[in-house]
């Protein structure tokens, strides 16, 4: 099988995996990765706080797709071809040792994203893939059966037989796709924290509780509920449970200018009557103790003092003087603590958007465009997003791998060595 000139626009996880899969499937393909920035795989580097949440330990495609607020249905078949188990096997076959943490997240044993980056760069280099940084694509047009790609500060356009667009959430990537006939679902942020304008809460920054049950309530929308850990920050609330809610509610939150109500059940293992009973028992059995310093529940002391203060219980008040009204208010706060969401905060570690190329315009058997022959897609440029970084990286690995196979299929064009040097250098 003769090779083709393959241009991969985007040097992130999806672009690299697509390029590697393509070059592996047909070693004669002349594959070039064009990265607009100064460094390759920059988002992989910051994933998981610099440790790189490679994937998630979920090997059943039917369960895996439930972690994708958008794109799960389209990914169902894709995950039957390349899923987290395949990702783990791929990296381990190349000497990268991985570990699975208690919450299912998979990291390199080194706890260093550089391990993953080095593996990908070394594999690409070994396969002869050309890696170009500071190669921002300004224009892409199709002339006959070829793509002419204009790169910044390069006088002549690059020519490719096939193109993989793996530009992540870059607006330029969306523009290129639209110019070639694709519909772009307007992108909005996903995976972000909630700004809560409550100085008393913010004073308790760093406090975390697990598990809680959190419910997001928005106007004219069904409530969304998630269970997991929550974290108090300098600007409000974060943690896995908040990030999951931000992902599932991304579009509705954007439409409502990131205003809504978050209701937190701090004791999901107890019913409201059980909480009331525990408080009443304290009033009976420890009447002389100060309420603020004696918490009958497995909660951080600083959280307990937040709620006793919030419902108007003085710091020195003893259990003997707890009124029925105060008891009911405190129980309600622990069972249904309510916070007004005043906006969204940043979550720079895993900044993700929902939106992108409409999925109905992509053939997920090959990741080929249904609008422009020879064009392929992978990664976050598509209208796909997961609830945490590991799920987003897995969709990048999966769509990149399938796109690489698709790019390599039917490679019948011939390219001379001289021509390849002229057009792809």
Locations of the language-model features?
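A conserved short coil-to-beta-strand element within the FAD-binding core of flavoproteins
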Residues: 133-146
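Glycine-rich active-site loop/strand segments that organize a redox cofactor
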Residues: 49-100
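A glycine-rich dinucleotide-binding beta-alpha-beta segment and adjacent secondary-structure elements
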Residues: 133, 305-385
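Short hydrophobic core segments
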Residues: 7-9, 34, 137, 156-169, ...
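An anion/pyrophosphate-binding glycine-rich loop and adjacent beta-alpha core
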Residues: 38-40, 46, 54, 58-61, ...
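N-terminal Rossmann-like FAD-binding beta1-loop-alpha1 element of flavoenzymes
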Residues: 4-33, 403-408
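Glycine-rich FAD pyrophosphate-binding loop
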Residues: 23-49
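A conserved FAD-binding loop/helix module that cradles the flavin
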Residues: 162, 166-180, 384-412
């Amino acid at each position: 099988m003769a090779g083709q000139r393959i241009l991969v626009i985007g040097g992130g996880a999806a672009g690299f995996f697509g390029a590697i899969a393509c070059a592996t499937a047909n070693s004669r393909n002349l594959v070039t990765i064009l990265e607009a920035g100064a460094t390759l795989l920059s988002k992989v580097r910051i994933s998981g706080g610099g440790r790189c949440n490679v994937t998630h330990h979920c090997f059943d495609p039917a369960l895996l797709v439930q972690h994708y607020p958008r794109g799960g249905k389209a990914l169902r078949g894709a995950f039957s071809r390349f899923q987290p188990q395949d990702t783990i096997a791929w990296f381990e076959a190349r000497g990268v040792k991985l570990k699975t943490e208690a919450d299912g997240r998979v990291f390199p044993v080194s706890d260093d994203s550089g391990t993953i980056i080095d593996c990908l760069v070394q594999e690409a280099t070994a396969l002869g893939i050309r890696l170009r940084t500071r190669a921002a694509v300004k224009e892409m047009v199709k002339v006959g059966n070829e793509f002419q790609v204009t790169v910044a500060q390069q006088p002549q356009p690059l020519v490719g037989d096939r193109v993989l667009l793996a530009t992540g959430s870059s607006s330029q990537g969306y523009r290129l796709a639209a110019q070639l006939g694709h519909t772009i679902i307007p992108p909005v942020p996903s995976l972000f924290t909630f700004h809560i304008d409550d100085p008393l809460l913010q004073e308790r920054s760093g406090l975390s509780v697990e598990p809680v049950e959190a419910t997001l309530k928005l106007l004219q929308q069904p409530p969304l509920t998630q269970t997991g850990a929550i974290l108090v920050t300098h600007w409000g609330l974060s943690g896995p449970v908040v990030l999951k809610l931000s992902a599932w509610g991304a579009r509705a939150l954007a439409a409502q200018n990131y205003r809504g109500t978050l209701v937190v059940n701090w004791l999901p293992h107890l019913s409201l009557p059980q909480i009331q009973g525990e408080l009443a028992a304290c009033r009976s059995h420890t009447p002389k103790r100060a309420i603020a310093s004696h918490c009958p529940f497995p909660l951080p002391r600083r959280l307990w003092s937040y709620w006793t203060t919030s419902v108007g219980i003085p710091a020195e008040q003893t259990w003997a003087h707890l009124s029925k009204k105060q008891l009911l208010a405190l129980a309600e706060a622990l069972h249904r603590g309510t916070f007004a969401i005043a906006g969204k905060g940043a979550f720079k570690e895993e900044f993700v958007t929902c939106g992108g190329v409409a999925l109905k315009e992509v053939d997920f058997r090959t990741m080929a465009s249904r609008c422009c022959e020879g064009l392929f897609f992978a990664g976050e440029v598509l209208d796909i997003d997961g609830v945490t970084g590991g799920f987003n990286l897995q969709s990048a690995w999966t769509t990149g791998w399938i796109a690489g196979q698709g790019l390599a299929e039917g490679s019948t064009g011939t390219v001379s060595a001289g021509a390849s040097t002229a057009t792809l250098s």
